Regions:
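Secretory-pathway ectodomains
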Residues: 2-483
Length: 483
């Protein structure tokens, strides 16, 4: 295993002379040279083997400890090897659920829309694709089945360690137009709470008119057009507080303004946003902790780091990022760069990107370093390093100084996909920009960036991304689970 055994020199015994030849009754037997040599070499070999075995045991123990440590880091996938294959393929009814990426108890959990238009909350084993349980929330719907709107994104969120809350509705869209498909309005909207271990329905209550939901411990915050935002007891639906967003102003239609309002959870805060206009922040009691401020470029909530970033655009068209912090916000140039995996090895780090990559201390707003690299996707933070994809490859930078540790390049005419890691390597698709050439999955060593292995992705898979503990292969019409 990369270790050399060192042979020791051994002195072999020659003939042994008797003190007095007259005392010898018969000739002394010849020394058994071969046996002495064999045992000596065997002892040395055994020692060398023991050293090798002991060293390997230590290395294996360290690797298992590292695997266990990284397995506890959100976003790190299970160890991958050079034999890349499709372990299971979600049917159409489960594809949206898998891509939504809500994981509990080792399963993808969320809403599923079947071919007959019925809806259910489902748990699908991440490793095997087996449906563990399915709890129906709406029966067959012929109209929905005709147009088969399977959109379920943002409908479910974890409410506790073993509880999933979902906003379910019988509205859907007609996809018979190229743009702006008309919506069939809901006649039944409810909040359901399901035990993720067995699918048992914990609560099922009405939520008339709600179109978005944010979940905090014991609280469902619902946004409903024309009705404002209400904080309700998650189990009973009892109203705890109400928030009415400010008027749109003379330059916006109030009806259009209120119909677009959405809510989202950001740690222990709730955001109330009108996309392209403003973001307000409330705490769990409904108290306004941040008045609506312009955020015409939107917002980012990074679950890996717990960072809430509000994005705005200057008059010159440049994007700026405001990091929301208790007591003191931090205003930074550039667009907040998402971090999909963070093991905490570079504390208080925030990254922004435009024509350059910048690192900041989120506590003080001071610049740590600037790199000429231009990030093309979310970053990974592991072992004190920052890993980012660019248009030409993958770069590893020292998290403290920004110095380049290593750089890899993709094949000519190719671009890298999003970065993932199994805690041993950086996993990234080397994918063609155009044409039918096959993509490859490449595993780069975390330390030196050398390819550990590379393998063609199965037919029809162009790129890959990490969701939960699995690596997904992305196809033209959905995703498959790779192993």
């Amino acid at each position: 295993m990369g270790h050399r055994s060192h042979m020791q020199s051994v002195e072999l015994l020659g003939e042994v002379a008797l003190p007095d030849a007259s005392l010898a009754v018969e000739p002394a037997p010849e020394p058994r040279r071969g046996r002495i040599r064999w045992w000596s070499i065997a002892v040395v070999g055994a020692v060398a083997l023991a050293v090798l075995v002991g060293t390997q045991v230590v290395l294996d123990t360290r690797q298992r400890a590292a695997d266990a440590r990284f397995a506890a880091v959100p976003g790190v996938v299970a160890p991958m090897g050079p034999t890349v294959r499709v372990t299971w393929r979600p049917p159409d009814a489960l594809s949206g659920l898998v891509l939504a990426g809500v994981v509990a108890d080792g399963a993808f959990v969320g809403l599923s829309v079947a071919d007959d238009g019925s809806q259910a909350v489902v748990a699908v084993d991440q490793r095997t694709g087996d449906v563990r349980w399915s709890t129906q929330v709406f029966g067959a719907d012929g109209s929905r089945a005709l147009w088969l709107d399977r959109s379920v994104a943002g409908r479910c969120a974890l409410a506790a360690a073993h509880e999933l809350a979902c906003l379910v509705s019988n509205d859907f869209r007609h996809f018979d137009r190229a743009s702006s498909p008309p919506v069939v309005r809901a006649t039944d909207t409810r909040v359901v709470l399901v035990d993720t271990r067995d699918g048992r329905m914990v609560a099922d209550r009405d939520a008339p008119g709600a179109t978005s939901m944010a979940v905090l411990p014991g609280l469902a915050v619902l946004g409903a057009p024309g009705r404002g935002v209400t904080g309700q007891d998650l189990l009973t639906g009892a109203e705890r507080w109400r928030y009415t967003p400010p008027s749109a102003g003379e330059d916006l239609s109030q009806a259009a303004f209120t119909s677009a309002i959405q809510v989202f959870a950001a740690g222990d805060l709730v955001g109330v946003t009108n996309p392209g206009w403003s973001v307000a922040l409330l705490d769990a009691t409904g108290e306004l902790v941040r008045k609506p401020v312009p955020a015409v470029a939107g917002y980012r909530y990074d679950q890996a780091t717990g960072t809430l970033a509000l994005l705005s655009t200057t008059e010159s068209g440049q994007v700026r990022t405001t990091i929301v912090r208790t007591g003191r916000d931090v205003d930074l140039p550039g667009t907040y760069l998402d971090v999909s995996v963070d093991d905490g090895s570079v504390p208080d780090l925030v990254l922004t990107s435009d024509v350059v990559l910048r690192a900041w201390d989120v506590r003080t707003g001071r610049a740590r370093w600037t790199s000429d690299e231009t990030a093309s996707g979310p970053a990974l933070v592991l072992g004190g390093r920052v890993y980012v994809s660019t248009m030409t490859g993958t770069v590893a930078l020292d998290g403290r100084t920004g110095a380049i540790v290593w750089r890899s390049t993709v094949s000519p005419g190719h671009a890298p996909g999003s970065l993932a890691t199994d805690g041993r390597t950086i996993l990234v698709a080397d994918q063609p920009v155009a044409g039918s050439e096959r993509s490859e999955l490449v595993a780069y060593g975390l330390g030196d960036g050398r390819p550990v292995w590379q393998a063609p992705l199965p037919d029809g898979i162009r790129s890959s991304t990490a969701v939960g503990r699995v690596l997904l292969g992305l196809t033209a019409d959905g995703a498959v689970v790779l192993g």
